[in-house]
Amino acid sequence: MRETLEALSSLGFSVGQPEMAPQSEPREGSHNAQEQMSSSREERALGVCSGHEAPTPEEGAHTEQAEAPCRGQACSAQKAQPVGTCPGEEWMIRKVKVEDEDQEAEEEVEWPQHLSLLPSPFPAPDLGHLAAAYKLEPGAPGALSGLALSGWGPMPEKPYGCGECERRFRDQLTLRLHQRLHRGEGPCACPDCGRSFTQRAHMLLHQRSHRGERPFPCSECDKRFSKKAHLTRHLRTHTGERPYPCAECGKRFSQKIHLGSHQKTHTGERPFPCTECEKRFRKKTHLIRHQRIHTGERPYQCAQCARSFTHKQHLVRHQRVHQTAGPARPSPDSSASPHSTAPSPTPSFPGPKPFACSDCGLSFGWKKNLATHQCLHRSEGRPFGCDECALGATVDAPAAKPLASAPGGPGCGPGSDPVVPQRAPSGERSFFCPDCGRGFSHGQHLARHPRVHTGERPFACTQCDRRFGSRPNLVAHSRAHSGARPFACAQCGRRFSRKSHLGRHQAVHTGSRPHACAVCARSFSSKTNLVRHQAIHTGSRPFSCPQCGKSFSRKTHLVRHQLIHGEAAHAAPDAALAAPAWSAPPEVAPPPLFF
């Protein structure tokens, strides 16, 4: 009781003597209130009591003084109660004791001297807005609720990468959980394909691909998507947004995964090696496409002609051939008639040409052909020039023609027309020779072909005196001097100097004879053997001896015959040893071509 009176006196209240209070139930109630206060802190915070009698007039003064500091506070509701329900002395005792204990608790909170805070082996959490609120700088020691935050530094963004795919993670635990999906150990597996997922919601989204459900349509085009994230990513193609810039070169990308793949070009990282050869790749998709070369897999098949492709983009380009009818192929004997009109050597792409040049309006079926054509309009012009003439220098846009209209084909000289190398769809032959009607799939091949008729051989071997009409033939011939045989057979290990020779040899193991004669139905493993065989039916002997005039159906027979005259091999003029111009009589149908 003395402590209570001293506390009231320290607050500026005038407190009477204890004997002034009546020795009745209020004193006992006051004593009971003190016992309840010491038993529980919750009862001290209530500040409401009941069951006491009204104070005497002498105590009224004390009650008014006790109520004075409560005006406008939480105990204002107690004033509306009848007098005597909550004695002011008891309330003041509780109020003072609670405030004193809270103040003492705040003063006693100190970090013990015998304890120290050690750095945790786990990575520091991302404080985010807490770091800004408490003014904690990354990597610098700080204080949060009395605990020293020392040793916390900025972590790498995603230091742990998955070896199976290109995803990266911030901690090893998440990486291990992700790797379980590659092993098929996820808790949620798709009942249709068996793919594993860590969450059931992800599995439900995946099952839309099996049902064909695409609930998110694009407002700009007709495409629909199974996930909203895919739609958001697709919309960037319409808006042109590229929110992910490269820190090295400033190039921007629409997807974060594309940025990660691009950054490997700066670091030189190629984490995906081929198990069959020594090549390495930056993306796993590139590795999968490359491995089809070793396995021979062609998973993309055309529904109209059953032709297969290794890449999906090759199938898409091929399908343009079927969208519109291609040009009619001229017959081989169309040039025999002097009044027949020679077919135009201008290439015709048998399908839509969606890639148009913005400068001259010329359209192309392939995007890379458009890029090659646009070099004519830019300053670099033709970066690959001829060492012997001016062909290949920078030309103007009007000078760019698909092919030369001269019957002799494009020449090599300052006044010759430039040739834009164009390519027909894979397997199609849209470039035809006006002299013999032979078709080619590439404009450059047609540009080299007239040398067969003119006998021109501009490429000479430095080891011997032989000359060739094309550079690839010269390169293949040079292997005869060096002994290089880079093409090996996987079945028997035999090596060849040319890839075509290897392909011809592999028919021995497979037993394939795709070239059949249209007259006798005899099959051959190579087209060359078929052409030689057809000379039996046509009676053609294109190789004649200049000494005696005897003709032969094969060049090797002519060379062997010339030994009789005492001449060395290959002594005949180049024009006489040119490729034979096979002329089939009208009664013999030309053989079908198999490619």
UniProtKB/Swiss-Prot annotation:
It is found in: Nucleus. Keywords: DNA-binding, Isopeptide bond, Metal-binding, Nucleus, Repeat, Transcription, Transcription regulation, Ubl conjugation, Zinc, Zinc-finger. GO terms for biological process: regulation of transcription by RNA polymerase II. It comes from the Eukaryota. Residues 1-67, 313-350 are annotated as: Disordered. Residues 325-343 have a biased composition (Low complexity). Its main location: nucleus. There is a cross-link at residues 97, 368 (Glycyl lysine isopeptide (Lys-Gly) (interchain with G-Cter in SUMO2)). GO terms for cellular component: nucleus. SUPFAM superfamilies: beta-beta-alpha zinc fingers. Transcription factor that promotes adipocyte differentiation and suppresses osteoblast differentiation in the bone marrow. Enhances the osteoclast-supporting ability of stromal cells. Binds with STAT3 the consensus sequence 5'-CTTCTGGGAAGA-3' of the acute phase response element (APRE). Transactivates several promoters including FOS, OSM and PPARG. Recruits a histone deacetylase complex. This is Zinc finger protein 467.
